Regions:
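Residue-level hotspots at or immediately adjacent to binding/recognition sites across diverse folds
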Residues: 1-275
Length: 275
């Protein structure tokens, strides 16, 4: 509540063993959190985390939620790994108080061995006021808008490879990062950028310095990305990246107001950068 100076650690009573991988905070008292798997949960608080209400539960075998995204304080979406060959998608239109699953026959079809990574909560992003874009990895890696599927020129072919995160500058300019999380220092096909709404993707001349699990657009031509072995920044729309830290993080997010970027990593580590 004070811009990251002080932190209060908490465990949600009754959900001590749940692996929560994504959070959306609307203000200092209201937030929703996503627990990933079997059963998958979404909880909501209106008192700053003192108490939580269960607003979504799915016990389907194989259910695995990957990320949430919100267009505003009312409309949101959650995406999960494929069930019966279709990606799981649910929507909320009341700020996360209730969620409705999209019928399976209307959900995007997944290729064999294709899934999403719950590494940073950023494999789905709002694209326009009504559309979202999401990315996949595994044996094959795609970017998808509704049922339009575009193959990504990222490393793939294994369960540990592919796209992990997408950031959107505008409806035409997107950046996708990933790699192979089992080879954290490899820069092979670990980032791409599109300037034409996904029709084509360009590899950097100088890529990030390893596997990257999260990317965020900052301003103008500046983007920032992080992974297990450090943090990189580009000031030329992804043509060249420079390593600015060897400290590894799973996720980074730009504050909704101001010029602060927050990082989170293993072992309860939190970082902060003012840009």
């Amino acid at each position: 509540l004070d811009g990251g100076t002080n932190w209060k650690w908490m465990t949600v009573k009754g959900f001590e063993k749940t692996d929560f991988r994504d959070i959306e905070a609307f203000d200092k008292t209201t937030a929703v959190i996503m627990g990933i798997a079997e059963p998958a949960y979404i909880l909501r608080t209106i008192d700053g985390g003192d108490t939580w209400q269960l607003v979504f539960e799915n016990k389907t075998k194989g259910m695995f939620l990957d990320a949430m995204e919100f267009w505003n304080e009312q409309a949101g979406i959650v995406i999960g790994d494929p069930i019966n060959g279709h990606f799981f998608i649910a929507r909320t239109f009341d700020g996360g108080q209730s969620w409705q699953g999209i019928p399976e026959n209307l959900s995007p079809v997944a290729d064999s061995g294709e899934a999403c990574f719950a590494s940073s909560g950023t494999n789905i992003r709002k694209l326009t006021k009504k559309e979202a874009v999401f990315i996949t990895g595994g044996l094959v890696s795609h970017v998808q808008v509704r049922n339009k599927k575009i193959r990504l020129p990222l490393i793939d072919g294994k369960e540990t490879t592919g796209a992990n995160s997408i950031a959107v500058k505008n409806k035409k300019t997107w950046m996708v990062v990933g790699g192979d999380f089992n080879t954290k220092d490899s820069s092979t096909k670990n980032a791409v950028i599109s300037f034409d709404g996904g029709k084509t993707f360009v590899l950097p001349d100088v890529p990030p310095t390893g596997y990257r699990s999260c990317v965020e657009f900052l301003k103008k031509k500046q983007w920032i990305t992080c992974g297990l072995n450090g943090v990189d920044i580009t000031n030329d729309d992804g043509k060249t990246f420079s390593n600015i830290s060897k400290e590894g993080f799973h996720v980074l997010r730009k504050a909704k107001k101001g010029k602060t970027v927050y990082f989170a990593g293993g072992g309860g580590r939190i970082g902060k950068m003012v840009w």
